[in-house]
């Protein structure tokens, strides 16, 4: 495809900014006046026509102005994204006041999601790091009749518990398993092949519970700002909103597109058809041995991409610092 001329790029950028601000189609006269373009209205109108022919602008109604198409937004994000506004510095100052307390990772992620939504006006989503198996720092076993409470403390400080039925275990067995686990974890992980034979009957039950998918498979997904999304004019019909709400409710992880790099997915670029009227701005964050989580902003294609991209990247890097 032939590259855009400098004037065509200026017109596309101005059209995107106008539509994001006003949600109104724009004509050449308004662009000249609002953005002080050094060209006549006829020249700008010609550039808009060329952009429409290339699929970067579209004319929603007869005799109306133009608005960006999904392809136009893509070119804008890839080639014309301006530097983020100075207001992003305000977000950075807010982030410096956050810290990770003992067993408070989910609380921290929720605070970050709230700040992202408040700053951008978009729905935010943050996942806890994915892991194939939790990195344990300690295991505590508490017996109550035929039930066993297993308390797990991970290296990240996150705490969880399991409630198992273990009628045949004795207190001496459980004490021995706890001591064995403590010694094993000093070396980094539990090696069940080294569990003493006399402890294997009770140990096998515990091993099965620790390897159950409820602990290790699907990361926690925190969503904030759904009310902001449904308030957008683009999502006022049940036909547009219904599939999106169902996806958020049933499978929020599907909002994130797999990948190890920051990405902006616009409209039908996203594999989920429920998001074809949306854009998703996402970035990964890494948490040492804990794995990788994701931060994302979801909104209409008509979004302030420079602010959204900058905010997601800054929160991801700040979270990595807190978790390092």
UniProtKB/Swiss-Prot annotation:
Per its UniProt record, what Pfam families does this chain match?
A: HrcA (PF01628)
Matching InterPro entries, A to Z?
Answer: GAF-like_dom_sf (IPR029016), HrcA (IPR002571), HrcA_C (IPR021153), WH-like_DNA-bd_sf (IPR036388), WH_DNA-bd_sf (IPR036390), WHTH_transcript_rep_HrcA_IDD (IPR023120)
Keywords annotated in UniProt? Repressor, Stress response, Transcription, Transcription regulation
Kindly list the cysteine pairs connected by disulfide bridges.
Answer: none
Q: Which SUPFAM superfamilies match?
A: GAF domain-like (SSF55781), Winged helix' DNA-binding domain (SSF46785)
Protein's UniProt keywords contain Magnesium: no
Record flagged with keyword Transcription:
yes
Entry GO MF terms:
DNA binding
**Protein's GO biological process:** negative regulation of DNA-templated transcription
HAMAP family reported for this sequence: HrcA
**Which family would the database say this protein is a member of?**
Belongs to the HrcA family.
In terms of NCBIfam families, this protein maps to: hrcA
Give a short account of what the protein does: Negative regulator of class I heat shock genes (grpE-dnaK-dnaJ and groELS operons). Prevents heat-shock induction of these operons.
- The name this protein carries in UniProt is Heat-inducible transcription repressor HrcA
């Amino acid at each position: 495809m032939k590259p855009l001329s400098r004037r065509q790029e200026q017109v596309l950028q101005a059209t995107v900014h106008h539509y994001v601000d006003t949600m109104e189609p724009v004509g050449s006269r308004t662009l000249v006046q609002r953005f002080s373009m050094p060209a006549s209205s006829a020249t700008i109108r010609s550039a808009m026509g060329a952009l429409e022919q290339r699929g970067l602008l579209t004319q929603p109604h007869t005799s109306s102005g133009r608005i960006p198409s999904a392809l136009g937004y893509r070119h804008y994000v890839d080639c014309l994204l301006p530097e983020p506004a100075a207001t992003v510095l305000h977000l950075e100052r807010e982030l410096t006041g956050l810290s990770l307390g003992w067993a408070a990772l989910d609380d921290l992620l929720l605070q970050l999601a709230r700040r992202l939504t408040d700053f951008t006006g978009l729905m935010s989503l943050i996942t806890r790091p994915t892991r194939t198996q939790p990195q344990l720092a300690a295991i505590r076993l508490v017996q109550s009749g035929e039930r066993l409470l297993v308390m797990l403390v991970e290296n990240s400080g996150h705490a969880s518990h399991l409630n198992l039925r273990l009628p045949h275990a004795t207190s001496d067995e459980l004490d021995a398993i706890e001591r064995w686990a403590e010694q094993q974890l000093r070396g980094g992980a539990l090696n069940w092949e080294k569990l003493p034979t006399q402890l294997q009957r009770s140990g096998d039950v515990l091993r099965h519970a620790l390897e159950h998918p409820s602990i290790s498979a699907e990361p926690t997904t925190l969503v904030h700002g759904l009310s902001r999304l449904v308030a957008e004019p683009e999502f006022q019909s049940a036909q547009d909103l219904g599939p999106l709400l169902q996806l958020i409710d049933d499978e929020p992880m599907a909002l994130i597109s797999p990948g190890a790099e920051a990405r902006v997915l616009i409209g039908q670029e996203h594999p989920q058809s429920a998001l074809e009227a949306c854009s998703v701005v996402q970035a990964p964050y890494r948490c040492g041995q804990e794995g990788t989580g994701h931060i994302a902003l979801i909104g209409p294609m008509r979004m302030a991409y420079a602010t959204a991209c900058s905010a997601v990247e800054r929160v991801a890097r700040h979270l990595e610092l807190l978790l390092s």
